[in-house]
């Protein structure tokens, strides 16, 4: 499966948005978008004016990169959101937030979503007492996400948890830092998702 293997800092610069793809570095003055707030490339300092379609496409690409998904996975999430009751755009964001890799990231067990995805794939977490190694697994309100006993000595996880106070944990989640576990208190509302996302643009793009 294809993956983006270049510097993730270029992605933030391309979208002109700090997407916190680099973990701790994003909170320092070493952050690439702080030092070079223009797109990468030879002609990056002159931003292009996009068409309506271009604006919609850029918004989709931004959200895909933010959550670390390829087109197939993102489209699948959109199709599920479109089939559910309620507003498709809000359903999409809720679906993305409830992915297990994102919940692990939001709880502070990993510095980035990419790192959280790797930890889930390597079987470090249990959901409601059972090992789950599928990053796209959708959590529900009341689910308990817990680090497995054998994984509690993993240095990167411990380091990430030490920095959780700086990043914060969203209100729809509850972290028991000492117990290496967290709870999905409720489904995230639109107000819980604070990143600047215009989900209606994505709906318009896929509706064409």
Swiss-Prot record:
Say yes or no: keyword rRNA-binding present.
yes
Q: Name one GO cellular component term.
A: small ribosomal subunit
Where's the S4 RNA-binding domain?
Answer: 98-161
Q: Name one GO biological process term.
A: ribosomal small subunit biogenesis
- The signal peptide, as residue positions, is none
Q: Which SUPFAM superfamilies match?
A: Alpha-L RNA-binding motif (SSF55174)
Q: Does the keyword Ribosomal protein apply?
A: yes
Arranged from A to Z, the UniProt key words for this protein are: Ribonucleoprotein, Ribosomal protein, RNA-binding, rRNA-binding
Q: Which InterPro entries match?
A: Ribosomal_uS4 (IPR022801), Ribosomal_uS4_bac-type (IPR005709), Ribosomal_uS4_CS (IPR018079), Ribosomal_uS4_N (IPR001912), S4_RNA-bd (IPR002942), S4_RNA-bd_sf (IPR036986)
Q: Which GO terms describe its molecular function?
A: rRNA binding; structural constituent of ribosome
What is this protein for, i.e. what is its function? One of the primary rRNA binding proteins, it binds directly to 16S rRNA where it nucleates assembly of the body of the 30S subunit. With S5 and S12 plays an important role in translational accuracy.
Q: What family is this protein classified in?
A: Belongs to the universal ribosomal protein uS4 family.
Subunit and interaction comment: Part of the 30S ribosomal subunit. Contacts protein S5. The interaction surface between S4 and S5 is involved in control of translational fidelity.
Which protein are we looking at? Small ribosomal subunit protein uS4
Organism, scientific name? Anaeromyxobacter sp. (strain Fw109-5)
Q: What is the lineage of its organism?
A: Bacteria, Pseudomonadati, Myxococcota, Myxococcia, Myxococcales
């Amino acid at each position: 499966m294809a993956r983006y293997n270049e510097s993730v800092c270029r992605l933030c610069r391309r979208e002109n948005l700090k997407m916190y793809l680099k973990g701790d570095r994003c909170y320092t003055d070493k952050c690439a978008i702080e030092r070079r707030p223009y797109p990468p490339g030879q002609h990056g300092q002159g931003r292009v004016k996009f068409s309506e379609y271009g604006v919609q496409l850029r918004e989709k690409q931004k959200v895909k990169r933010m959550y670390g998904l390829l087109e197939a996975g993102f489209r699948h999430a959109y199709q599920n959101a479109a089939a559910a009751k309620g507003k498709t755009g809000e359903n999409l964001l809720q679906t993305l937030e409830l992915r297990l890799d994102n919940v692990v990231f939001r709880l502070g067990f990993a510095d980035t979503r990419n790192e959280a995805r790797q930890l889930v794939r390597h079987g470090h977490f249990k959901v409601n007492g059972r090992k789950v190694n599928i990053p796209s697994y959708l959590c529900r309100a009341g689910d308990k996400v817990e680090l497995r006993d054998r994984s509690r000595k993993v240095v990167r996880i411990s380091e990430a948890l030490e920095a959780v106070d700086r990043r914060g944990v969203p209100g729809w989640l509850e972290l028991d830092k000492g117990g290496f576990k967290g709870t999905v208190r409720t489904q995230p509302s639109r107000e819980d998702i604070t990143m600047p996302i215009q989900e209606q643009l994505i709906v318009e793009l896929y509706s064409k």
